Amino acid sequence: FLPLFASLIGKLL
């Protein structure tokens, strides 16, 4: 799991 991907999910949430 990439941290950048997690950042995108955080913005969606």
From Swiss-Prot:
Main localization, broad class: secreted
Residues bearing the modification Leucine amide: 13
Keywords: Amidation, Amphibian defense peptide, Antibiotic, Antimicrobial, Secreted
GO cellular component, one term: extracellular region
Record's keyword annotation contains 4Fe-4S: no
Subcellular location: Secreted
GO-annotated biological processes: defense response to bacterium
Domain of life assignment: Eukaryota
Signal peptide: none
UniProt note on tissues of expression: Expressed by the skin glands.
Keyword Ion transport appears in the UniProt entry: no
Similarity remark: Belongs to the frog skin active peptide (FSAP) family. Temporin subfamily.
Function statement: Antibacterial activity against Gram-positive bacterium S.aureus (MIC=140 uM).
Protein name: Temporin-1Cb
Organism expressing this protein natively: Lithobates clamitans
Source organism phylogeny: Eukaryota, Metazoa, Chordata, Craniata, Vertebrata
